[in-house]
Amino acid sequence: VSSRGLGDVYKRQIENGSFTFSTPDKIIATPGSDGIAKFENIEIYEGNYLTKEFKVNAAKLDDKYILPNTDIDTTTIRVSVTDGDTGTIEVYNAYENIFQVNSESRLFLIQEITDEKYQILFGDGVLGKKPPNGSTIKVSYIVTNGSDGNGASNFNFSGNLSYPKRNGDVIVDTPITSNISLLTVPQASENGDNIEPVDNVKYLAPRVYASQYRAVTANDYTSLVPSVYPNIDSVTAYGGEELDPPQYGKVFI
């Protein structure tokens, strides 16, 4: 049994209004001996699930893949590329670092541009695979309301469930329209936040770049901790050599 990301919707009315929660990925569950398929420990994200497609045109040297929406939860961005000749679909993953990246690494980079929008960047064929000419890039993502969606705990499922059914020599997804049980939610929604203020970006960006994702000095910790725990308000770090008596080789956060 599969639960599709597209249209996979959970609705909840809370104090701040009515909100939609979605899943960015297709989720699959295998029925047990009792014939019941259980979807467990599923993370759902506040916001509407959207998709955007781009056609790769090598003749356009300035071709850009810009997502038209603001307030995108960048952790939910998913990218796939369909070859225009063979129809083969390849999934691309977000860059984490460039270690062991080669010309066939299927990776993409998210770059924030003006007006709080995002551009999707790909490799050049040397560092990362370059989508072939004529292929179709499909980007899916969730547009969120930030912190307003926090506190939801009871949901109504209004998405799509299906199961694979053989139709001759072809296996097709067949919708499930009955015998769907209620949802169990172990905790209320949390950690939703608004887009990072420009002042924070200006302060942290050079420090993150200088640290190169290595935590050595106190300043390194100040810049890296927010990327690990994005919902903290502020960070202070200092070296043990500033204490009395000094504690060399330690950093306090």
Question: In which residue ranges do the predicted regions lie?
Answer:
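Carbohydrate-recognition loop of C-type lectin domains
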Residues: 212-253
